[in-house]
Structures are given as C-alpha cells and as structure tokens.
C-alpha cells in the first residue's frame, strides 16, 4: 500500500477543494493518504482584509516529513506563471532532503489554479516539475486517458501536466465537476504508480 501526501497552499479555497478531490482519488486505490498544507506567510490581519480562506482543516506540514511518503502531490495557485511564494518558501527549505537524496525515486505530481483560462496553468505545473526533477522524483501528470480534459465545449481546466481549475479574477468561479474529476483521476493515477514502484 502506497503512502501519499497531498501538500497544498490555497488562498481562497480553490486549491484546497482540488486537494481533497486528489486525496479522494488516491484513497480509491487503497493508499494511505494524508492532506497537509504549507504555512501562510501573509500576516493574519492582511489576509483577513483580503478575504483569504483561513479556516482550513488540514494541518501544516514539516519539511522533514516529506521523506516519509511514497508519493507527494503538490497543489499551488499560480503567481505570474509560477508557484505561489508560500509553496516556494517551503520548497526552498528542502535542501537537506536533496543532500541526502531523500526524495529520489518517489513519485511527484502537481495541480494548480489560475484566475483565467490562459493564466499560466501549464507554466506553473512545468516549472514546479523542474524542482521535482532536481530531487530525483518520478514526475507524473494527468494523462489523456482522462478524457475530461479534451474538448472545447466549455471553459475548463486540466492539462496533461496536471489537474487544474479556473477561479476567475475575483475567485467567484468554483472548481467544476470535470475539474474535480480530473483531480480525482490524478490522485488515483499517482497512487497506483507509487504502489507499483513500492513493490519493486
């Protein structure tokens, strides 16, 4: 049985919703799944003034615990085509794990949220993949066997690089059914691969 960590940062709750969908999919494979988040860097008063979603149930992760999992599925909103600073600050503390090769051979995957349809989903995912490659992780995306990412009948997220959602500039759009199903598919897919690698 694979042990999977879903580790996310969410400002307004969109990535949080996707994280729990990812976890749901991973659990369908029989994996042991833990959902955690990275710390918020914005002062609480400022976060409240800007309507951040601060009532998130997931506990805050530590860098050291990343080595305890067979797979880590990271979730972050985009910031100008890159991961959010909160996630970057957490990732930048993993140098000790890198020195030990603690994440080599583990499965890594990423999902994201953007304000607009062309707001940097793919660059956020692929730039995050670079970090995972440096750690020697086995990088897994969202394959086209998830057919929900095809078609042009509606505005929707999901890419071959990872699941995604579109939040709109004011955060009013919530993850759609097909976006959440993409997240569940990615969770199942990653957990299944992690289980196979763990048996080898």
From Swiss-Prot:
Record note on cofactor = Binds 1 FMN per monomer.
Binding positions for substrate?
Answer: 98
E.C. number, please?
A: 1.6.5.2
- Superkingdom per UniProt: Bacteria
Per the database record, which ranges form the Flavodoxin-like domain? 4-190
The entry assigns this protein to a family as follows: Belongs to the WrbA family.
Name listed for the protein in its UniProt record: NAD(P)H dehydrogenase (quinone)
Q: What is the species of this protein?
A: Methylobacterium radiotolerans (strain ATCC 27329 / DSM 1819 / JCM 2831 / NBRC 15690 / NCIMB 10815 / 0-1)
